[in-house]
Amino acid sequence: MLKFHRNVKPQFGAFARYSSLGKHNSRKRVGIIRLAYGLTGIGLVGLAGFAWAQDRHEKTYQKKGVQVEGPWQFYVLTTLPLRTLSRWWGYVNRIEIPLWMRVPAFGLYSKIFGCNLTEADPDDVRQYKNLAEFFTRKLKPGARVIDPDAPIVIPADGKILNYGVIEGGQLEQVKGITYSLDALLGDEKLARLKRSHAIPSPDHIPHIRQEEFAKLNGIHYSLQDLMGHDHGERPSHVKDASAQHIDLLSSTKVAAKSQFTLFGSRETNCLYYAVIYLAPGDYHRFHSPTDWVVERRRHFSGELFSVSPFMARRLGNLFILNERVALMGRYKYGFMSMIPVGATNVGSIRIKFDKDLCTNQFGKLGPVGTFDEAVYTSSSSILHGHPLLRGDEVGNFELGSTVVLVFEAPADFEFLVKQGQKVRVGLPLGRVVPSSH
C-alpha cells in the first residue's frame, strides 16, 4: 500500500504541474483576446474620429443658412460623419464578392427588401460581381411600358411621397412641413462654377433632325438658330450664351406669382411638383419624364441624411439639406426640372450623359446653398441643350433615394397618382384635362 501511494504521488505532482501550465496558457489566451478587443475598439474609435474629422473638415466653410428642423434627436444627426461613411460604403460596394457567396447574399437581400429578380437583366445574380452592380441592375426589354400619351410619366420605381401645386414658392414635404423652391433649385448668384459642356446628341435620335425634335415637342427656337452652325461645331457665341443665358430660376420665381413669361409660357399655367421615394429594393435607375431639353445642371454638395418616409415626416428641409443634382430645362408646356437627391449610403448620383459630374467627393463644402453649375448649350446649336425622349435613362443611384420633379403645366393639369402609392417607370403621372369650351 505504501509503495502504491509512493507511485501515485509523482503522477499527481506531474498532473498538478500540467494543470498549472494549462491555467497559465488559458490566462495568456484571455489576455491576448482582451488585447485584440482593446485594439479593435481603439481602431474603431480612431476610424470614427477620422470620419468625424473628415466631415468637419469638409463643412468648415459652410455658413449659417438652411438649418435642420425637427426634434432634438435629429440635431444629433448633424454631428455624425454621414458623408464619409457613405463614401466608405461606396468603396465596400465595389469589392468583388466570391462567386459562391453571390446567390445566398443577393438572395437574402432580395428577400428582405422585396427585389423582383425575374425582371432584372441579367436575372442570374452570379453575374453581378459586387453590390454596386447589383444595386444598379438593368431591366429586361419591355419590363416597363412608357405611356405615349401622358404629358408627364413616372421617372422612377418607388412610392409617391407627395405631389401638388407650388404656392408661394413653397413645396410641401409632408403635411405641415414645407421647404423653399428657391433653396431647392438654387440662386444664380450662388453658382461657384460655370462651364460649357459639349455633349453630342443622343445616339438613339440621329434620324430626327433637331428642328423636328423641337417642333414635335413644342420647344421654341429662333430663325437664327436654324441658320446657325451645324451640329458638332462650337458656335462663337456659346461662351456668352452660357454666361448670359436666361436664368431658369427666374421662371420658378415668376411661376410662384402666376406671371409666366419664359419659353412662351401662359399666365394660366401653374407650377407643380412630385416626390418619388426609391426604397433599397426598388429598381435604382431613373428615366426622363417627358420629351424635353436639359439646358443646365446644378450640383449641390450637402448632407446625406436618410430620405425614408419616416425621416421625411420628421426632418424639415430634408431635400434641400441633402446633396442633390438639379437638371433644368424646358419642354412642351414650359419649365421642367428633375432633381435626384442623395441619401445615407447613396452619395453617388450618376447622370448618364454627364461624365464630369462627381458627387460626394472629399473636399470642403461651400456655404449652404452654393452649387457647381454646368450648361449644355453647346450640345446643340439648335436646341441649346441636351435632348431627352420620355423613358430615356437619365442616371442612377447606388441605393434607394428620392427623385423630385418640378414642372410647369396648364392650370387644368391633374395628377393621376395618390400619396403613398407604389409606382413604376412609365406610368402616367398626370394629364391635362380637355377644356369644356
From Swiss-Prot:
Record has Plastid as a keyword: no
Pathway membership: Phospholipid metabolism; phosphatidylethanolamine biosynthesis; phosphatidylethanolamine from CDP-diacylglycerol: step 2/2
Effect of disrupting the coding gene: Impairs growth on non-fermentable carbon sources (ethanol and glycerol).
The protein's Enzyme Commission number: 4.1.1.65
Cofactor notes: Binds 1 pyruvoyl group covalently per subunit.
Cofactor (UniProt): pyruvate
Residues bearing the modification Pyruvic acid (Ser): S401
Mitochondrial matrix side: 19-38
Active site: D157, H287, S401
PTM text: Is synthesized initially as an inactive proenzyme. Formation of the active enzyme involves a self-maturation process in which the active site pyruvoyl group is generated from an internal serine residue via an autocatalytic post-translational modification. Two non-identical subunits are generated from the proenzyme in this reaction, and the pyruvate is formed at the N-terminus of the alpha chain, which is derived from the carboxyl end of the proenzyme.
Transmembrane segments: 39-57
Subunit structure: Heterodimer of a large membrane-associated beta subunit and a small pyruvoyl-containing alpha subunit.
Protein name: Phosphatidylserine decarboxylase proenzyme 1, mitochondrial
